[in-house]
Swiss-Prot record:
GO CC, any one term: plasma membrane
Alphabetized InterPro entries for the sequence: NAD(P)-bd_dom_sf, RCK_C, RCK_C_sf, RCK_N, Trk_Ktr_HKT_K-transport
Domain RCK N-terminal: from-to ranges: 6-122
Source species of the chain: Bacillus subtilis (strain 168)
Sequence positions that bind NAD(+): R16, D36, I37, N38, N56, A57, I78, G79, A80, K103, A104, Q105, H109, E125
This protein's name: Ktr system potassium uptake protein A
Knockout mutant characteristics: Impaired potassium uptake.
Pfam families: TrkA_C, TrkA_N
GO molecular-function term, one example from the UniProt record: identical protein binding
């Protein structure tokens, strides 16, 4: 099983949310550029980033000097300053950054970010609340991502019932209309697993599908 290849991320805004993203991406072995206007915050996260830089992300020249165009993903995690967050996002769009993820402060901020073309808008408290509730209600659910009101991606813990079965044995797509995107086994990740790949108890299955179909697979297939 092959590992996920390393990517390049820039995290702008090193508050509690941005700092935690920076730490986790760095822990996973990705290249991370950590950016904040506050020197104290930059120093605090310098050991959790490939590069940590003091910069004003609302200034285009400063973004360019960071080599921001070299990054596939930029996460705008600026705190309560909605104006700075919005302007930074707008500049990143103008610089053709392919994937811009932005933390929204409220509903109105969300609507503005939609208008200017943010690729993914994050509400940390709301998103985390959904994940925690899902985990509390089902012990087999390790993680949960809403794609829409109807579809989601879920990480499920393989039960003893699935041990030693292959993907083709489960036939999840035909029986339940779901797709197994990946299998995690002892830190290794197999993306787009082959029909003959074997599942072991305690493996993590990353499954995408309609929420009702995923729940049906949990209830009947696991």
């Amino acid at each position: 099983m092959g590992r996920i290849k390393n990517k390049q991320f820039a995290v702008i805004g090193l508050g509690r949310f941005g700092g935690s993203i920076c730490k986790e991406l760095h822990r996973m072995g990705h290249e991370v550029l950590a950016v904040d206007i506050n020197e104290e915050k930059v120093n605090a996260y310098a050991s959790y980033a490939t590069h940590a830089v003091i910069a004003n992300a609302t200034e285009e020249n400063e973004l360019l000097s960071l080599g921001i165009r070299n990054f596939e993903y930029v996460i705008v995690a600026i705190g309560a300053n909605i104006q700075a967050s919005t302007l930074t996002t707008l500049l990143l769009k103008e610089l053709d950054i392919p994937n811009i993820w932005v933390k929204a402060q409220n509903y109105y901020h969300h609507k503005v970010l939609e208008k200017i073309g943010a690729d993914r808008i994050i509400h940390p408290e709301k998103d985390m609340g959904v994940k925690i509730a899902q985990s509390l209600s089902d012990e087999n659910v390790l993680n949960y991502i809403d794609l829409s009101d109807e579809y989601s991606i879920v990480e499920l813990l393989a039960t003893r019932k699935l041990d030693s079965k292959s993907i083709i044995d489960l036939n999840v797509r035909a029986k339940y209309g779901c797709t197994i995107l990946a299998i995690k086994h002892h830190g290794d990740i197999c993306l787009s697993p082959a029909p003959e790949d074997i599942i072991r108890e305690q493996d993590c299955l990353v499954i995408m599908g309609h929420k009702k179909d995923i729940k049906r697979f949990e209830n009947e297939g696991m």
